[in-house]
């Protein structure tokens, strides 16, 4: 809710709670920030499943959000404060062509280019917030796909004011350590019942 924070970018592995964080922030914005919102996903099927299995249950489970939810149609939730929550996929540029949004929530953006086949869906979605350049909130959440050209990897390593990363406590010295590959040590590997030295690929 800090006025100076215009965006949050989350790059993480599988099964690390990214969707839960995204929906929690979306729910907060519905409650505290009147204005048009958009939730985006890579494909139409992913969007349909996310709406049925995550978004609508979230809106029903919370008494506050349930009271704010108005009429719901395909890919659109009308809120009782007069604003809207739109749902859009990277596969369908027509869904976002004429929509201006204040708060944007992007899910698995590294898959957008493959799903769309052409164009730059990530840039297209961000352009939808241009009219709210001083008040917008953009949350980009994705696991990295490919090499350093990954969209989310570039997002978290360029033009970022503050970077946060997980740290774990060393069982020997109890000092917190960043989980970078060069800090992970595998002493022995059990293979076919025998202890062996791990190869670089197995470390």
Placement of each model-derived feature along the sequence:
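Phosphate/NTP-binding elements of NTP-utilizing enzymes
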Residues: 1-203
